[in-house]
């Protein structure tokens, strides 16, 4: 049965009108672009039949080249040939220099500490370099499909943080692409595999690419996959194999460690060629910088064994997080070109107790999964073929003190999904909490849509902030939202179900998203003001309680100073000056420091009364 589709507004295709979409695997070493044609996902080749595009850009004063042509210049013009730029995305210059000391580029720091690479074309940042790779892939797709792309899905490592993901989005925008979604690489592989297998049970996706390693533990059931746990290492991949082997060759050849960039590139190219050859041969002859020697697979295995072991330790942690044992895993899907290394396949097979699946091309599977997802998101799938994969069109959250909206699940999150967040009580002795579920992108309750209200009762009567309530949002594959609130110490809970998309048209959703962008600056200022007002109310509430209990600890003059500070805070909190409220809060804190210290001393004396030193 087809599901209610929750998707980005305006993406549904008219009858018989097919929109052009592509999936892009923006890899560290190689990149691919794929699309769905005649119901089948396939990667797109260049004019010479090559599907992989080396993630390399060579810059000159009058232009640049991408891919194989660029890689051919790597040894001749190292400083202007940028490769593995994905590793630099979202990182500071200091971080790059610490993590990747082997890079043969000259860097400068921008004003905010971000890296700028010196090239013949000028100073370039990683976003610009990535954009040039994306442009080349988009051009390949546009030519193959004979039309402009309506949208793309770009894959990223599961361990990419917000800065790295935002950098990828910026690169796509610079390349003139409309990003339908960023998709984690292991999830993309699971999409491709889930469509083809028809199996049910726990599956491990072992993704060892050029620059990153990811492990995902998934549960497949009737075509639906649920991510149980993920793990990995954002600074471990086949490139590290290459550098280890290059260092070994350098030592064997007696090449100085500080040799020029051309020799360094020649060493690296020789190492890459040897690694590839050793996947099929027991030994290989290496010629570099006038030296010739033999390297065996056994020697290579000794070099990389510690790195392979690191990946298996990450697998062990992911299994533990998922709550499953290795022998419960039915299949192990291998993703990434580095999984062709025999030692990797051997050790992974030993760890999981079964030979890993290699029937799906490990280089192509991520791009194929991205293409399938792009085809869905752009609106090409008829209802009868809808997958249980969709997105939340508008953020879901809760009303908090001051009329603010705290977003729990952001828009464009893939469903099914569950997210939890902890909240606490605002007043002393509070025994109930009203839960107001909101939908929208704005910062204030008045600008968002109310979905539901319910109350959690039976909260222990504790001081403000003493009770901890965990609120869990869960959206299932049908788009049904369940919200549960539970007081953690007692286990008392309340819940409600609501259909978050019900009653909203595509145009209304689009309008809400547009408003969030138009009023972004205004909303942020309003939120800052509301937060300061909430903090002022909290400070005054706490102070009034303290004065009611222990005013005797103050002299008349001291009490007057505190009362004046509190009155001033109460007055400015009625206005709209954020800085004035903040300063008034700081002033109350300053004027009450001695009072707070006396209250603490008094509490300690009361606690010790009637006890000897030995008892304490």
Swiss-Prot record:
<comment type="similarity">
    <text>Belongs to the heat shock protein 70 family.</text>
</comment>
<dbReference type="GO" id="GO:0051082">
    <property type="term" value="F:unfolded protein binding"/>
</dbReference>
<dbReference type="GO" id="GO:0016226">
    <property type="term" value="P:iron-sulfur cluster assembly"/>
</dbReference>
<dbReference type="InterPro" id="IPR043129">
    <property type="entry name" value="ATPase_NBD"/>
</dbReference>
<dbReference type="InterPro" id="IPR010236">
    <property type="entry name" value="ISC_FeS_clus_asmbl_HscA"/>
</dbReference>
<comment type="function">
    <text>Chaperone involved in the maturation of iron-sulfur cluster-containing proteins. Has a low intrinsic ATPase activity which is markedly stimulated by HscB. Involved in the maturation of IscU.</text>
</comment>
<dbReference type="InterPro" id="IPR013126">
    <property type="entry name" value="Hsp_70_fam"/>
</dbReference>
<dbReference type="GO" id="GO:0140662">
    <property type="term" value="F:ATP-dependent protein folding chaperone"/>
</dbReference>
<dbReference type="InterPro" id="IPR029048">
    <property type="entry name" value="HSP70_C_sf"/>
</dbReference>
<dbReference type="Pfam" id="PF00012">
    <property type="entry name" value="HSP70"/>
</dbReference>
<keyword id="KW-0547">Nucleotide-binding</keyword>
<keyword id="KW-0067">ATP-binding</keyword>
<dbReference type="GO" id="GO:0016887">
    <property type="term" value="F:ATP hydrolysis activity"/>
</dbReference>
<dbReference type="InterPro" id="IPR042039">
    <property type="entry name" value="HscA_NBD"/>
</dbReference>
<keyword id="KW-0143">Chaperone</keyword>
<dbReference type="InterPro" id="IPR018181">
    <property type="entry name" value="Heat_shock_70_CS"/>
</dbReference>
<protein>
    <recommendedName>
        <fullName>Chaperone protein HscA</fullName>
    </recommendedName>
</protein>
<dbReference type="GO" id="GO:0005524">
    <property type="term" value="F:ATP binding"/>
</dbReference>
<dbReference type="InterPro" id="IPR029047">
    <property type="entry name" value="HSP70_peptide-bd_sf"/>
</dbReference>
């Amino acid at each position: 049965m087809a599901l209610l589709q929750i998707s980005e507004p305006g993406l549904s295709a008219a009858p018989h009108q097919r929109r052009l979409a592509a999936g892009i695997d923006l890899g560290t070493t190689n990149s691919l672009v794929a699309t769905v044609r005649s119901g089948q996902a396939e990667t797109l080749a260049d004019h010479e039949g090559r599907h992989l595009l080396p993630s390399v850009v060579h810059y000159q004063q009058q232009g640049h080249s991408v891919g194989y042509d660029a890689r051919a210049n790597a040894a001749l013009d190292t400083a202007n040939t940028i490769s593995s730029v994905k590793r630099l995305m979202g990182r500071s210059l200091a971080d790059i220099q610490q993590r990747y000391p082997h890079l043969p580029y000259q860097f400068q720091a921008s004003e905010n500490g971000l890296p700028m690479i010196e090239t013949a074309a000028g100073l370039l940042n990683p976003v610009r370099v990535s954009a040039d790779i994306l442009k080349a892939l988009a051009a390949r797709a546009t030519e193959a499909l004979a039309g402009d792309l309506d949208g793309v899905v770009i894959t990223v490592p599961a361990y990419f943080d917000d800065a790295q993901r935002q950098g990828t989005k910026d690169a796509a925008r610079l390349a003139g692409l409309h990003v339908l979604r960023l998709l984690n690489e292991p999830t993309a592989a699971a999409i491709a595999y889930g469509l083809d297998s028809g199996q049910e049970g726990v599956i491990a996706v072992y993704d060892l690419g050029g620059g990153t390693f990811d492990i995902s533990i998934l549960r497949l059931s009737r075509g639906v996959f649920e991510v149980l746990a993920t793990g990995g290492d954002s600074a471990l991949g086949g490139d590290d194999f290459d550098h280890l082997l290059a260092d070994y060759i350098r030592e064997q050849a007696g090449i100085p460690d500080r040799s020029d960039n051309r020799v360094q590139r020649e060493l690296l190219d020789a190492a890459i060629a040897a690694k590839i050859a050793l996947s099929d041969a027991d030994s290989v002859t290496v010629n570099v910088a006038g030296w010739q020697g033999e390297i065996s697979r056994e020697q290579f295995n000794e070099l990389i064994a510690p790195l392979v072991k690191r990946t298996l330790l990450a697998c062990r942690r992911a299994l533990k997080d998922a709550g499953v044992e290795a022998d419960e895993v039915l299949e192990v899907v291998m993703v990434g070109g580095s999984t062709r290394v025999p030692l990797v396949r051997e050790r992974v097979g030993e760890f999981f107790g079964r030979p890993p699946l290699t029937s799906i091309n490990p280089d192509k599977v991520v791009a194929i999964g991205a293409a399938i997802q792009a085809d869905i998101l752009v609106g090409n799938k008829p209802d009868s073929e809808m997958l249980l994969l969709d997105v939340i069109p508008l953020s879901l959250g809760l009303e908090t003190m001051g009329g603010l909206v705290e977003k729990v699940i952001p828009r464009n999150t893939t469903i099914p999904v569950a997210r939890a967040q902890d909240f606490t009580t605002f007043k002393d002795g509070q025994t109930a909490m009203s839960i107001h579920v909101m939908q929208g992108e704005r910062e204030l309750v008045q600008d968002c849509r109310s979905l539901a209200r319910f109350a959690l009762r039976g909260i222990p009567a504790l001081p403000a902030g003493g009770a901890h309530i965990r609120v869990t949002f869960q959206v299932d594959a049908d788009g049904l939202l369940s919200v549960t609130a539970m007081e953690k110490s007692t286990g008392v809970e309340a819940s409600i179900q609501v259909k978050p998309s019900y009653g909203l048209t595509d145009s209304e959703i689009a309008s809400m998203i547009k408003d969030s962008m138009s009023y972004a600056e205004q909303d942020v200022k309003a939120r800052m003001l509301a937060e300061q007002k909430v903090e002022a109310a909290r400070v005054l509430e706490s102070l009034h309680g303290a004065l009611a209990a222990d005013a005797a600890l103050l002299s008349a003059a001291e009490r007057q100073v505190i009362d004046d500070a509190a009155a001033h805070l109460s007055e400015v909190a009625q206005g709209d000056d954020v800085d004035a409220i903040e300063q008034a809060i700081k002033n109350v804190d300053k004027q009450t420091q001695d009072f707070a210290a006396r209250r603490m001393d008094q509490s300690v004396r009361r606690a010790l009364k009637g006890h000897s030193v030995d008892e304490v």
